[in-house]
């Protein structure tokens, strides 16, 4: 009965019926547009823009605009979107996720809503996972938009600011998710409004949306600067950790990836470093370095988590298997790995700006996405991004044969069987794609195939430059390709001549991923557009997923049956157990991402306030009123501190107040105790503010209005940037230890919100105090110019204990700020450091 009701009231079915009706309406007018000349078709863009200006909405234009793009696509590329692609386009325009199977033409589908929304002139961002796909799509699909009179931009990491600004100014901009996030952060660190590159965030269509909004949701984008620190401790901690023995000196939990010293290990450490107590406050740094060295040796594996290339430790993305060049683990883990591998240890970094993809993409007015696999994460898309997942039917039925899993007792038996299966298929000429979850697995299978004399291509983090070419050739007769973790997403595997007759592409999975979605992505490489295909997963009881969730019991059962390594089992019970393990991991990861978002929202609200005010500073012509208000707030606090309400006026420490006023706001001797004696705090405030304004006016007269306005901006920007950097670090420190509050029966999130707010208020007060002091006391130089507090560079996060996907929040970095020679001197003179206290260096 419930099943019948669900079918009757299924909202997805209703949505699809609505989309199908719109697709039929578009199809019904195709003849009108086929008869138009090229010029008449192009003129439709101008007509649509005029109608929008007169009050029409994009929804009003949808049917006609989609029909125009469809016809333009046929003329320019020779491709004519099917009805199911029109339905996918409507889903995207509605701000939803279109789940379309591999080979169903997602890229072409996106052109429909992208064109329609670009007509508003507010800009549309098409987001892809790598620069190869961004460049390819901008070139291929860009021709359609340019034919219709719209401009297309491509935003790449290597571009200058001027080139980026031009790319963002276009009607449609193709970019990677990383570049969009980093450009947003960099825009909020600029010193002049003209240096900004992005426009307000209007509409984004994300290709492979699950990869960006789910897999990478916990990845904070970080812009960091160098912090001067000694590398000696890393070397010493590394040498010590090499002497430790597993279980005896440290314990390692494979589920949570947590490593910690045992009592015996702690005693060893105290002996080795000649100290009494490793947990003494003065040994915090040593303790931290030993823990990071342990993590580097035990939890971080070479060729799985990172590779060593050209003397550098390069992080491997655990989802795509790609190298993340230029990114570094924070909290000293990267340096610990460098020490482990015997490489040159580079300086730690300090965070200047940070944002997660979750919070960046939620800033768009409208967000849409497409992928082949999103249904398993439907709840997360709905709860966090307010996006529905709409499964678009395939143009032709899927005839792929998905075989049940084959389960072996050991890894050795499993890999032998994989090599044997590949060899047999190779003999018949059937192309094979072997999917692995780690670089080392791909190299092991490659070795086994070499021994059998089977030519093959390996696609992993070490050689992803040839990725697209290898993937495109993977469907040719006799091709054998080994790929790590869905490398090659977004690139179609087209079947070569005679391959259909051999059964299509065979996909062989060597391990189940902890996410069903990634298994489905691998399956989806085969059987595109109604082609035949076959998929087979090989598992062993020693696989990480099986070990994590009770493989011991199953192993004992298999032993009782006398099962050896040459015979696999195809058991529905084991397959169900694997799937329930995956569901459990997915649930854990969803909870983890949701919790991170709640914590990150605290920093998001603060970041939005600071960035908004910072923009007002660089956009404003005159900051005089703002600066005066800052001075007044700072002065009010100073007076309140020396004239507490609970004390009698004769107990007030007026000498201290006079000293403070003269050293911070006025000149020596400008205020006497007699001036304020017997007055109420309000009267003191009025009197002192009058004198401050007089001094301010004199300063402005001396240096001229123009110079004074620029001076105010320099001071305010510098104060905001340096205090905000300190605040990010302080919030991180708070975040690290907040979970311990749960032991005191308090809600850690509530505590974090309250303390974070108090710290933010304190930061605002510090900014006001610093601005007041520098504006009133610093001297103005003739060659006045705004300067960055620290030069920034992009960096990565650090995997955290208990974080199954190795995607985690960035950890705090202790700052030791080097004063640049051209920076204002810390003594408050207003001169450059090199002309003041730094003159002797």
Curated annotation (Swiss-Prot):
Main location (coarse class): membrane
Keyword Kinase: no
Species the sequence originates in: Bacillus subtilis (strain 168)
Cofactor(s) the protein requires to work: Zn(2+)
Keyword annotations of the record: ATP-binding, Cell membrane, Cytoplasm, Membrane, Metal-binding, Nucleotide-binding, Protein transport, Translocase, Translocation, Transport, Zinc
Subunit (UniProt): Part of the essential Sec protein translocation apparatus which comprises SecA, SecYEG and auxiliary proteins SecDF. Other proteins may be involved. Monomer and many different homodimers can be isolated, some of which are not formed in the presence of a synthetic signal peptide. A single SecA monomer interacts with SecY in the channel. Only shows some colocalization with FloA or FloT membrane assemblies.
Cofactor: binding comment: May bind 1 zinc ion per subunit.
Similarity comment: family membership: Belongs to the SecA family.
Protein name per Swiss-Prot or TrEMBL: Protein translocase subunit SecA
Broadest EC class assigned to this enzyme: translocase
Gene Ontology annotations for the cellular component aspect, listed alphabetically: cell envelope Sec protein transport complex; cytoplasm; membrane raft; plasma membrane
Catalytic activity: ATP + H2O + cellular proteinSide 1 = ADP + phosphate + cellular proteinSide 2
InterPro entries for the chain: Helicase_ATP-bd, Helicase_C-like, P-loop_NTPase, SEC_C_motif, SecA, SecA_CS, SecA_DEAD, SecA_motor_DEAD
Gene Ontology MF annotations: ATP binding; metal ion binding; protein-exporting ATPase activity
UniProt cross-references to PANTHER family, sorted A to Z: CHLOROPLAST PROTEIN-TRANSPORTING ATPASE, SECA INNER MEMBRANE COMPONENT OF SEC PROTEIN SECRETION SYSTEM
Function: Part of the Sec protein translocase complex. Interacts with the SecYEG preprotein conducting channel. Has a central role in coupling the hydrolysis of ATP to the transfer of proteins into and across the cell membrane, serving as an ATP-driven molecular motor driving the stepwise translocation of polypeptide chains across the membrane.
Residues in coiled coil: none
Listed result of changing residue 587 to C: Forms position 587-750 dimers upon oxidation in vitro. Does not form position 587-587 dimers (homodimers)
Sequence positions that bind ATP: 79-80, 85, 103-107, 492
CDD domains (UniProt xref): DEXDc_SecA, SF2_C_secA
Binding positions for Zn(2+) per the UniProt entry: 825, 827, 836-837
Stretches the record annotates as Disordered: 786-813
């Amino acid at each position: 009965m419930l099943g019948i009701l669900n079918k009757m009231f299924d909202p997805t079915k209703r949505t699809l019926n609505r989309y199908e009706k719109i697709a039929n309406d578009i199809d019904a007018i195709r003849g009108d547009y086929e008869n138009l000349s090229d010029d008449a078709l192009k003129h439709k863009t101008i007509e649509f823009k005029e109608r929008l200006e007169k009050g029409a909405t994009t929804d009003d234009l949808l049917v006609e605009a989609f029909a125009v793009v469809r016809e333009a696509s046929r003329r320019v590329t020779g491709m004519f979107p099917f009805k199911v692609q029109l339905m996918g386009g409507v889903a995207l325009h509605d701000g939803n996720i279109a789940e379309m199977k591999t080979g169903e033409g997602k890229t072409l589908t996106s052109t429909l809503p992208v064109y329609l929304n670009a007509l508003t002139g507010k800009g549309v961002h098409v987001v892809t996972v790598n620069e190869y796909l961004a460049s390819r799509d901008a070139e291929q699909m860009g021709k359609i938009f340019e034919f219709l009179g719209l401009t297309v931009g491509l935003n790449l990491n290597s571009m200058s600011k001027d080139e980026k600004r031009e790319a963002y100014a276009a009607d449609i901009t193709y970019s990677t998710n990383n570049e969009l996030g980093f450009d947003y952060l960099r825009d909020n660190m600029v010193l002049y409004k003209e240096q900004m590159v992005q426009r307000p965030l209007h509409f984004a269509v994300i290709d492979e949306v699950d990869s960006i909004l789910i897999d990478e949701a916990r990845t904070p984008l970080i812009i960091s600067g160098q912090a001067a620190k000694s590398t000696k401790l890393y070397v010493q901690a590394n040498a010590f950790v090499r002497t430790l023995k597993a279980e005896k000196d440290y314990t390692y939990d494979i589920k949570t990836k947590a490593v910690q010293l045992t009592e015996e290990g702690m005693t060893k450490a105290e002996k080795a470093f000649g100290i009494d107590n490793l947990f003494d406050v003065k040994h915090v740094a040593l303790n931290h370095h030993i823990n990071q060295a342990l993590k580097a040796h035990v939890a971080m594996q070479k060729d799985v988590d990172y590779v060593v290339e050209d003397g550098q430790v390069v992080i491997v993305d655990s989802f795509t298997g790609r190298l993340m060049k230029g990114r570094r683990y924070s909290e000293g883990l990267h340096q610990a790995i460098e020490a482990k591998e015997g490489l040159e240890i580079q300086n730690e970094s300090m965070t200047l700006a940070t944002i997660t993809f979750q919070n960046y993409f939620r800033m768009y007015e409208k967000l849409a996405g497409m992928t082949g696999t999103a249904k398993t994460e439907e709840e997360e898309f709905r709860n966090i991004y307010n996006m529905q997942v709409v499964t678009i039917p395939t143009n032709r039925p899927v005839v792929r044969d998905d075989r049940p899993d084959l389960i072996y007792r050991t890894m050795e038996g499993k890999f032998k069987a994989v090599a044997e299966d590949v060899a047999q298929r190779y003999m018949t000429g059937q192309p094979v794609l072997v999917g692995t979850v780690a670089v080392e697995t791909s190299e092991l299978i490659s070795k086994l195939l070499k021994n059998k004399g089977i030519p093959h291509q390996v696609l992993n983090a070490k050689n992803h430059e040839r990725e697209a070419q290898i993937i495109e050739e993977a469907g040719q007769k006799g091709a054998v390709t080994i790929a790590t973790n869905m490398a090659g997403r977004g690139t179609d595997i087209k079947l070569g001549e005679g391959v259909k007759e051999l059964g299509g592409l065979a996909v062989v999975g060597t391990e189940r991923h902890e996410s069903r979605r990634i298994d489905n992505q691998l399956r989806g490489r085969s059987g595109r557009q109604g082609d035949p295909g076959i998929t087979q997963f090989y598992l062993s009881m020693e696989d990480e997923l099986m070990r994590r969730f009770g493989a011991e019991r199953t192993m004992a059962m298999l032993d009782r049956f006398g099962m050896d390594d040459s015979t696999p089992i195809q058991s529905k019970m084991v397959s169900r157990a694997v799937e329930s393990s995956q569901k459990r991991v997915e649930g854990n990861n969803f909870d983890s991402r949701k919790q991170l978002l709640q914590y990150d929202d605290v920093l998001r609200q603060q970041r939005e306030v600071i960035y908004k005010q910072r923009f007002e500073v660089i956009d404003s012509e005159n900051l005089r009123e703002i600066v005066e208000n800052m001075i007044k707030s700072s002065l009010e606090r100073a007076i309140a501190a020396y004239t507490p309400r609970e004390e009698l006026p004769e107990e007030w420490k007026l000498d201290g107040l006079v000293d403070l006023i003269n050293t911070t706001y006025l000149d020596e001797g400008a205020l006497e105790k007699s001036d304020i004696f017997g007055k109420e705090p309000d009267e003191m405030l009025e009197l002192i503010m009058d004198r401050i304004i007089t001094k301010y006016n004199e300063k402005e007269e001396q240096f001229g209005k123009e110079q004074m306005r620029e001076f105010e901006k320099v001071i305010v920007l510098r104060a905001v940037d340096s205090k905000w950097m300190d605040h990010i670090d302080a919030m991180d420190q708070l975040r690290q230890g907040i979970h311990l509050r749960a032991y005191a029966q308090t809600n850690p999130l509530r505590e974090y919100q309250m303390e974070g707010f108090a710290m933010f208020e304190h930061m605002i007060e510090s900014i006001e105090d610093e601005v007041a002091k520098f504006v009133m006391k610093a001297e103005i130089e003739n060659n006045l110019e705004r300067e960055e507090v620290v030069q920034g560079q992009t960096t990565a996060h650090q995997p955290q204990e208990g974080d199954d996907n190795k995607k985690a929040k960035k950890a705090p970095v202790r700052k030791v700020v080097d004063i640049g020679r051209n920076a204002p001197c810390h003594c408050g003179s207003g001169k450059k450091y090199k002309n003041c206290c730094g003159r002797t260096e």
